[in-house]
């Protein structure tokens, strides 16, 4: 009996993007922008803590979905891990063997710092690991369209995972 072809999967999570998109989906349009200062100043405030808890992401579900495409050979999450909204996920992600890539606050790093760093790493990985067959991009903004297109041109199957209602249609169209 012939062995099925081994599929090798790389997962890239723009964690800030997903956390903010999901928070807004749970609490209403632009809710994170309105709550950001309160979250930063006092994440332990009971009302803030409850809003964060209600907007928790099922990280395991995302990783399990990506693993359904094959062997996970690398999984990276990009965010400012010192931010209270992201820090609560650290142990969960580390337990799932996710590499945490530290991005410094937006003022020092630039608004789309995660987009640039994630895209550069993904393209580098495709050349460094030529046996990668699948690339999973966990994000929702259209800035990732060129990355999805490049991955496809380099022969990779591209999966996009985003928050319903806030994922750019162009990103969905660029993925397989």
Predicted regions and their residues:
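A short local structural element in Rossmann-fold oxidoreductases
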Residues: 23, 148, 172
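Structured loop/turn residues at beta-strand edges in well-structured enzyme cores
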Residues: 7, 130, 173
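Domain-level signal for Mg2+-assisted phosphodiester chemistry and nucleotide/NA-binding surfaces
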Residues: 1-121, 127, 152, 157
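Phosphate- and divalent-cation-binding pockets in alpha/beta enzyme and binding domains
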Residues: 88, 121, 146-147, 170
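Receiver (REC) domain switch/active-site residues of two-component response regulators
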Residues: 176
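Amphipathic alpha-helical transducer elements in NTP-driven molecular machines
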Residues: 56-59, 116, 145, 165-172
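Active-site histidine-anchored catalytic micro-motif
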Residues: 113, 128-166
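Short, glycine/polar-rich helix-capping loops at beta-to-alpha or helix-loop-helix junctions
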Residues: 85-90, 163-173
